[in-house]
């Protein structure tokens, strides 16, 4: 037999290690602790002591069964004392057995019945109870008989007896023996009718939802061909397999990321609500048009204020939001500072306006910004009402305006179209009532409704940092009601609404749908076009705002994946595009029309070219803004982009393609749509110089005295001569000098002399653009 540790022996006999150590000490065997080992001799002595104790416990049980008086404590005395071992007085212990308390009567027999295996040793004893008792005394006193005559010696064997079943710890021992009886398995709970989960569940989580043991689910999964552990995540298919086996329905919950305000905003805006809670809301109207055609004067006449007089040059300096009340109905007007801000809002996905009023001067007709406004409104998908202004002037010709607008698919109702035309005089107030009636008519057709009983959502019209009040934002509530004290997230900022001021400069406590209001209380300045959402508590708003701010900091407002000719074929293959948006700028109107007509004929695999804007002149920043909002490609024919436009295109990742031959532009776009573009040389603009003075020298030609305004001019670079935004010549530099010395390059801020090969028609204020060709490979 191998050595056994104390704690192992105690565990095997279901007693504490302390009692085993005490029993070994009674046998004269010293052990240090529960980790000590018991050798074979000591183990044999300990087993004999245990066997003897078990026999002592069994003897009272046998006598109890034959005792008619039911006195179960009679034979217990031989186990309690070992000093009195006379064989001629077998009945004396029985007489002394009546002294102990009767509380141990039922506990004395229980341990004996719990150790049936130990009773097998009694077959070797004699047939009488006295002989059995004598055997017990001999077994228990043999290891330590020398200690039987000292004081307190009677308790020594009794301590050994306590090691098994007797004494004051019998109750505790009884509890230990009771725990060995296998408990009745609990009745399993009824299966639920349906469980709801999002994304995935672990085996343990699914077992908890089904009120089943994880091991049961693991077995079922194994039988279904899925090997999984208790902490392994299960996909939707595995969850459905298990639940189908149990007959439980499964529902997947789609969680909306509240930090993604755009998605959350759309879900909240399109949330199904009780029709009885919806009320009619005022329409939001944007006034657009060419410079000095009377946009602000119109709004001024409607509000009976003199806003125009306080503005420099009659140009609106900030975004104004005003609300008017006509015939007991309200209309919200937005006055935009040009179309850039409007386009920027649309580029961020903020569809805040319902109706567009296009102001056209009757004496001026359709102008370039008028066309831009039409393209913006059409791209946003808004209904257009044309206000023909300045009809009071003698040279006014409204019919000419209508005729010109038909070219842009704005056909008057009087001519069989669906566009409302309203002749007005903003200065004298003529026709304004009719215009307002038309606005209310269109809004009634659109069925504009909102729920004022919900938490507010909307968009930012403008924002600024005020020295006295801190971050200030002008908001347009699109749905719900905004109250003072509401926790709010605005774009990447957050806070609590501290104060609200309406368009009349009065403090208000709450505002409803389609109402503009200026608020304070944000931690930072948001951007125009940002969404705002009111949340239930400030803690949630703070967490969402901080999360969005940290994400924005990491992303650094990374540019979206704009469409370019390089990746056009990939977008088409992925099925992301049904049409290619193109903006065309050229030197003359004839080139614009020819190029647009040729591009419209291109059709590759059902994808065609859509011309969203055409104009004559250099590519400007407004073109880039429109291209960024519409995900369009800009094509320039015999024109160049301005420095601001080039910088904006780089920031917005807008693709600009410049050509001097029409068929090359057409071939390039068609090849891109077919995915057949080969590696090519890319042009890199390295600098620009302005011609300050020209000197004609015989045998040399015209020397241009230039000042480098951007980048640098190098001796081996190609150059273009640009006059009024139009390329007049393209060639190479013949000489580049500085202070009569040849120079390899001249940097920004320095003057130089330049002659161009085969070109002497250089004039003052011309721009010399230097470029180099770099070989690139299409991605």
UniProtKB/Swiss-Prot annotation:
CDD domains: IF2_eIF5B, IF2_mtIF2_II, mtIF2_IVc. It comes from the Bacteria. Residues 82-93, 117-167 have a biased composition (Low complexity). Residues 389-392 are annotated as: G4. Residues 44-193 are annotated as: Disordered. The keyword Protein biosynthesis applies. Residues 66-81 have a biased composition (Polar residues). Residues 53-65 have a biased composition (Basic and acidic residues). Keywords: Cytoplasm, GTP-binding, Initiation factor, Nucleotide-binding, Protein biosynthesis. NCBIfam families: IF-2, small_GTP. This is Translation initiation factor IF-2. The gene is infB.
């Amino acid at each position: 037999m191998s050595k056994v540790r104390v704690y192992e022996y105690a565990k095997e006999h279901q007693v504490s290690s302390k009692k085993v150590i005490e029993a070994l000490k009674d046998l004269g065997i010293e052990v240090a602790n529960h980790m000590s080992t018991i050798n074979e001799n000591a183990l044999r002595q300990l087993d004999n002591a245990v066997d003897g104790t078990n026999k002592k416990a069994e003897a009272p049980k046998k006598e109890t069964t034959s005792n008619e008086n039911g006195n179960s404590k009679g034979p217990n005395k031989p186990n309690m004392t070992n000093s009195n071992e006379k064989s001629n007085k077998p009945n004396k212990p029985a007489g002394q057995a009546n002294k102990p308390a009767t509380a141990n009567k039922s506990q004395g027999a229980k341990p004996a019945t719990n150790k049936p295996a130990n009773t097998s040793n009694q077959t070797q004893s004699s047939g009488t109870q006295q002989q059995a008792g004598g055997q017990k005394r001999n077994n228990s006193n043999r290891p330590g008989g020398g200690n039987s005559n000292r004081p307190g010696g009677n308790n020594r064997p009794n301590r050994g007896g306590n090691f098994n079943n007797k004494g004051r710890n019998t109750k505790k021992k009884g509890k230990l023996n009771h725990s060995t009886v296998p408990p009745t398995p609990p009745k399993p709970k009824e299966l639920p009718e349906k469980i709801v989960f999002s994304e995935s569940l672990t085996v343990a989580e699914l077992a908890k939802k089904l009120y089943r043991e994880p091991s049961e689910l693991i077995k079922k999964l194994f039988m279904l061909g899925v090997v999984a552990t208790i902490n392994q995540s299960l996909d939707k298919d595995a969850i459905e397999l298990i639940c189908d086996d149990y007959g439980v329905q499964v529902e997947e919950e789609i969680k909306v990321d509240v930090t993604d305000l755009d998605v959350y905003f759309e879900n909240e805006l399109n949330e199904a609500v009780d029709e009885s809670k919806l009320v009619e809301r005022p329409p939001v109207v944007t006034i657009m048009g060419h410079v000095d055609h009377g946009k602000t004067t119109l709004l001024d006449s409607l509000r009976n204020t003199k806003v125009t007089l306080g503005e420099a040059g009659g140009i609106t300096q900030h975004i104004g939001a005003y609300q008017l009340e006509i015939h007991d109905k309200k209309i919200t007007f937005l006055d935009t500072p040009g179309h850039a801000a409007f386009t920027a809002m649309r580029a961020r996905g903020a569809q805040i306006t319902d109706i567009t009023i296009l102001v056209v001067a009757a004496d001026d007709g359709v102008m370039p910004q008028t066309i831009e406004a039409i393209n913006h409104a059409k791209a946003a998908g808004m209904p257009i009402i044309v206000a023909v202004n300045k009809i009071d002037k003698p040279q006014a010709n409204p019919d000419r305006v209508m005729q010109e607008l038909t070219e842009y698919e704005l056909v008057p109702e009087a001519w069989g179209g669906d566009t409302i035309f309203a002749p007005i005089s903003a200065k004298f107030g003529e026709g304004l009532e009719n215009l307002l009636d038309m606005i209310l008519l269109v809004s009634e057709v659109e069925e504009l409704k909102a729920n004022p009983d919900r938490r507010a959502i909307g968009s930012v019209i403008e924002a600024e940092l005020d020295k006295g009040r801190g971050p200030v934002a002008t908001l347009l509530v699109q749905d719900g009601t905004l109250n003072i004290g509401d926790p709010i997230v605005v774009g990447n900022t957050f806070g609590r609404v501290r104060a609200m001021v309406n368009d009349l400069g009065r403090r208000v406590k709450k505002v409803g749908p389609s109402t503009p209001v200026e608020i304070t209380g944000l931690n930072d300045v948001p951007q125009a076009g940002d969404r705002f959402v009111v949340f239930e508590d400030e803690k949630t708003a703070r967490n969402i705002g901080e999360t969005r701010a940290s994400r924005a900091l990491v992303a650094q407002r990374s540019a979206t994946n704009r469409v370019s000719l390089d990746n056009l074929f990939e977008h088409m293959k992925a099925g992301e595009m049904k049409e290619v948006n193109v903006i065309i700028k050229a030197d003359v109107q004839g080139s614009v029309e020819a190029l647009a007509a040729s591009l419209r004929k291109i059709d590759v695999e059902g994808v065609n070219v859509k011309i969203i804007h055409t104009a004559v002149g250099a590519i400007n920043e407004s073109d880039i803004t429109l291209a960024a909002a519409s995900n369009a490609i800009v094509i320039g024919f015999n024109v160049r982009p301005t420095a601001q436009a080039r910088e904006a295109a780089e920031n917005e990742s807008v693709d600009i393609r410049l050509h001097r031959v029409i068929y090359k532009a057409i071939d390039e776009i068609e090849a891109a749509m077919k995915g057949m573009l080969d590696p090519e040389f890319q042009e890199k603009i390295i600098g620009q110089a302005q011609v300050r003075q020209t000197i004609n020298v015989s045998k040399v030609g015209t020397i241009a005295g230039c000042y480098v305004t951007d980048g640098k001019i190098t001796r081996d670079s190609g150059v273009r001569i640009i006059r009024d935004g139009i390329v007049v010549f393209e060639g190479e530099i013949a000489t580049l000098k500085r202070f009569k010395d040849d120079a390899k390059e001249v940097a920004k801020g320095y003057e130089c002399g330049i002659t161009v090969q085969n070109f002497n028609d250089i004039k003052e204020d011309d721009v010399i653009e230097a470029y180099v060709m770099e070989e690139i490979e299409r991605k």
